[in-house]
Amino acid sequence: MARYRCCRSQSRSRCYRQRRRGRRRRRRTCRRRRASRCCRRRYKLTCRRY
């Protein structure tokens, strides 16, 4: 299952897949179906899958 990161509306083409490398910065991770929900509602962000 690929996890997706939320990106800012300014750079909506820049959505990164969350890799399992040690990154301390945790942003809201979105799944396929919940991508539009978690990113759009609270943070007004767009989630895109590569």
Swiss-Prot record:
Superkingdom in the source lineage: Eukaryota
Any one Gene Ontology cellular component term annotated for this protein: nucleus
UniProt-listed GO biological process terms: chromosome condensation; sperm DNA condensation
GO terms assigned for molecular function: DNA binding
Tissue expression from the record: Testis.
Keywords: Chromosome, Developmental protein, Differentiation, Disulfide bond, DNA condensation, DNA-binding, Nucleosome core, Nucleus, Spermatogenesis
Subunit organization: Cross-linked by interchain disulfide bonds around the DNA-helix.
Family: Belongs to the protamine P1 family.
Name this polypeptide is given: Sperm protamine P1
Organism: Saguinus imperator
